Amino acid sequence: MSTWGQINLMDPASPIQMEMMLFHDHAMAILIGIFTLVSLLGVKLCFNTLSTRTMHEAQLLETLWTILPAFLLVWLALPSLRLLYLLDEQGSEGIILKAIGHQWYWSYEMPSMNISNFDSYMIPEEDLKPGDYRLLEVDNRPMVPYGLDINVITTSADVIHAWALPSMGVKMDAVPGRLNSMGFHANLPGIYYGQCSEICGANHSFMPITVEAIDVKDFIKMCN
């Protein structure tokens, strides 16, 4: 999860989030190169006292500043399209976890595993135990097996919410009367935190999302 003074993305816990981090680094490298080039040209322009009034065209220069930006855009677009395709395909055939947004808590069910609907409320600050995280702990968190695909289906019982789990690379709207679907694949066991990412009313900040990834054998025992 995020820590104090963090300047980068959260540590990835799923393949798709790892791909997102690589794409972020790829895009940042291009942006830093553009920034450096423009800065050097700006400094050169500021300190250059020479000028020419006889040159009316420079076809080579015009060709370069047309082709180079087009090349950079293609270099940025190709991995972006690949990542977009992976996001759409991830977890579509996995175990179904249904998340229903309410003001201001989440309820979950796993129909394919015979886990009926249960509510997940934030634990008040005065009830936290040592080591718990403020505004992130819940009284009843969904369990999922790590190493298997999970297909999250979201909807809402009232207003628009957003179910987000940053370390898994998941964020999607929960809209009343509509089912949205997105998948993730937990690489490691652990507890993963998120929050509602759509302003949904007075207690929007008190609507955490906590998912625990456990071993497949333990998950089967829990379901039985």
Swiss-Prot record:
Its cofactor is Cu cation. Cu cation A1 binds at H161, C196, C200, M207. Its main location: mitochondrion. Its EC number is 7.1.1.9. This is Cytochrome c oxidase subunit 2. Keywords: Copper, Electron transport, Magnesium, Membrane, Metal-binding, Mitochondrion, Mitochondrion inner membrane, Respiratory chain, Translocase, Transmembrane, Transmembrane helix, Transport. PROSITE patterns: COX2, COX2_CUA, COX2_TM. It catalyses: 4 Fe(II)-[cytochrome c] + O2 + 8 H(+)(in) = 4 Fe(III)-[cytochrome c] + 2 H2O + 4 H(+)(out). The keyword Secreted does not apply. Component of the cytochrome c oxidase (complex IV, CIV), a multisubunit enzyme composed of a catalytic core of 3 subunits and several supernumerary subunits. The complex exists as a monomer or a dimer and forms supercomplexes (SCs) in the inner mitochondrial membrane with ubiquinol-cytochrome c oxidoreductase (cytochrome b-c1 complex, complex III, CIII). Residues 1-26, 83-224 are mitochondrial intermembrane. The gene is COII. Mg(2+) binds at E198. It comes from Albinaria caerulea (Land snail). It is found in: Mitochondrion inner membrane. Component of the cytochrome c oxidase, the last enzyme in the mitochondrial electron transport chain which drives oxidative phosphorylation. The respiratory chain contains 3 multisubunit complexes succinate dehydrogenase (complex II, CII), ubiquinol-cytochrome c oxidoreductase (cytochrome b-c1 complex, complex III, CIII) and cytochrome c oxidase (complex IV, CIV), that cooperate to transfer electrons derived from NADH and succinate to molecular oxygen, creating an electrochemical gradient over the inner membrane that drives transmembrane transport and the ATP synthase. The keyword Magnesium applies. GO terms for molecular function: copper ion binding; cytochrome-c oxidase activity. It is a multi-pass membrane protein. GO terms for cellular component: mitochondrial inner membrane. Binds a dinuclear copper A center per subunit. It holds the Pfam family COX2_TM. Belongs to the cytochrome c oxidase subunit 2 family. InterPro entries: CcO_II, CcO_II-like_C, CcO_II_C, Copper_CuA, Cupredoxin, Cyt_c_oxidase_su2_TM_dom, Cyt_c_oxidase_su2_TM_sf. Cu cation A2 binds at C196, E198, C200, H204. One of its GO terms (biological process) is ATP synthesis coupled electron transport. Residues 49-62 are mitochondrial matrix.
